[in-house]
Each structure stands twice: as structure tokens, then as C-alpha cells.
Design a protein with these regions (language model features):
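C-terminal membrane-associated helical module and adjoining short loops/tails
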Residues: 1-17, 27-28, 47-55, 125, ...
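Active-site His/Glu-centered metal-binding helix of metallohydrolases
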Residues: 26, 56-64, 81, 85, ...
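Cytoplasmic-side transmembrane-helix entry/capping segments in multi-pass membrane proteins
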Residues: 78-82, 109-110, 135-141
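Hydrophobic alpha-helical transmembrane segments of integral membrane proteins
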Residues: 13-14, 22-26, 76-79
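Transmembrane helix-loop junction
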Residues: 35, 66-67, 96-97, 123, ...
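Membrane-water interface of transmembrane alpha-helices
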Residues: 114-124
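Membrane-embedded alpha-helical segments that form the functional core of polytopic membrane enzymes
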Residues: 27-74, 90-111, 165-182
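Core segments of transmembrane alpha-helices
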Residues: 24-31, 82-93, 118-119, 141-153
Length: 225
């Protein structure tokens, strides 16, 4: 039994798309350690490099999975987890090094809360076999969010963009991503609530139908008494 399972497990892990997804997870602690323990500006650029590589794998793992016919349940399970680990880790380390501080923590908190909300909704909807497609607006949110976090990782080591520093450009992008996060999060929440209500209705109907015929008379007698 073991010899049959081992090649399957190895094959799953050694598929190129899955290896890229795993590489994205491996890059997370590397960029965190670089930003915290190395000296600036080297720390900023090393962290940015790991982050950029992680973002690139986010595109290519899905693309290659489709192109090579290597789509798998493991990849579908791991890919969104890797994305959320990357976003959450970068936001937290940016707060830790004071790149995000004061009122700028608010959009970071909004983005984190939305990630948790969407994860919960996706898990629930997957159980009832209801797809939760990614909207065009959500893709724009992800793009702006990725760019903003990249600017913030570079921070003071980056160039000036007219009157704005690299950090300020990142902060503006973070606010924009947070705004889109609220809009897309509300859309997902509405869809989720509707599906939850539908599931509850079906459950209530299934509970009423089996007992309705035999208990009708008894129910009336109890009410009358």
C-alpha cells in the first residue's frame, strides 16, 4: 500500500505548478528575515526581490497548470493559501518595521479582514459545491495591492516619484486597494449570505417533509388540547 502512495505523493509535489506554489511559500520567511535582520537599504531590496519572485510564481503556477495539463486538487488547495500567507506576512512585517504605522494600519487591517472573510466564504461554498468566481474588480484589487506592497517593501531605499517618495506611493496604493477590498468584499459577502440562506431553506424543507404526513393528525390534536 505504501509503495503505491509514495509515487503519487512525489508526483503531486514535483509538478512544476505545485513546486512554484511551494516556492512562493518558502519565499515568505526569507523576505521577512531579510527585512527585519539585514541593514537598509540592502534589506529593502532583498525583501523586494523575494516578494517579486513570489508574485511572479503566483502568475506562472496557474498558467503552467493549465498549459501543461497539471491542474490538481493539491494546487487548488495550496494556491489561495500561499497568496493569503504572502499578503498577511508582508503586511505584518511592514507594520513591525514601522513602514506601515498610525492611520495607515487601517487599510492594512481592512485587507487582512477581507482575506479572512473570503477564505471562510470560499470554504463554506466549496462544501455546498457553489463556485465563487473571481470578479474583474477583485483582479484589479489584487494588482494594486501587489504593487503597493512592493513599493512599501522598497520604502526609503527607493527613488522619488515627483513630489512623492516610494513609501508614499505605496501608502496611496494601499488605500486604493483597501477601498476596492471593501467593495469586492461586500460583493462576496452578499453572495455568501444568499447561498447560506438557500442552504438553510433547503435544510428546513428536508426536515419538514419526512415528518409532515404521519404527524399531521397528532400535531392537530396536540394544538387542540
Amino acid at each position: 500500500m505504501c509503495p503505491r502512495e509514495t509515487p503519487g505523493a512525489l508526483g503531486m509535489l514535483t509538478k512544476i505548478p505545485n513546486m512554484l506554489t511551494i516556492g512562493r511559500i518558502v519565499a515568505i520567511p526569507l523576505l521577512v528575515v531579510a527585512l527585519i535582520f539585514l541593514e537598509a537599504p540592502l534589506a529593502n531590496w532583498i525583501a523586494f526581490t523575494f516578494y517579486t519572485l513570489a508574485c511572479v510564481t503566483d502568475f506562472f503556477d496557474g498558467y503552467l497548470a493549465r498549459a501543461l495539463g497539471q491542474q490538481s486538487a493539491f494546487g487548488r488547495f495550496l494556491d489561495p493559501i500561499a497568496d493569503k500567507l504572502l499578503v498577511a506576512s508582508v503586511l505584518l512585517v511592514l507594520v513591525g518595521v514601522d513602514r506601515i504605522s498610525d492611520v495607515t494600519v487601517l487599510p492594512a487591517a481592512v485587507i487582512l479582514c477581507r482575506e479572512i472573510l473570503v477564505s471562510g466564504l470560499r470554504e463554506f461554498l466549496a462544501e455546498v459545491r457553489v463556485p465563487m468566481p473571481v470578479t474583474a474588480l477583485a483582479k484589479w484589487k489584487t494588482t494594486i495591492q501587489m504593487l503597493a506592497l512592493g513599493f512599501l517593501l522598497v520604502g526609503p531605499a527607493g527613488p522619488e516619484f515627483g513630489p512623492l517618495s516610494t513609501t508614499e506611493v505605496g501608502v496611496i496604493g494601499l488605500w486604493g486597494a483597501a477601498l476596492l477590498t471593501l467593495v469586492t468584499g461586500a460583493d462576496y459577502l452578499i453572495v455568501g449570505i444568499r447561498q447560506i440562506a438557500a442552504v438553510d431553506e433547503r435544510a428546513a424543507d428536508s426536515e419538514e417533509k419526512p415528518g409532515s404526513s404521519p404527524d399531521t393528525g397528532g400535531g392537530k390534536m396536540r394544538k387542540a388540547g
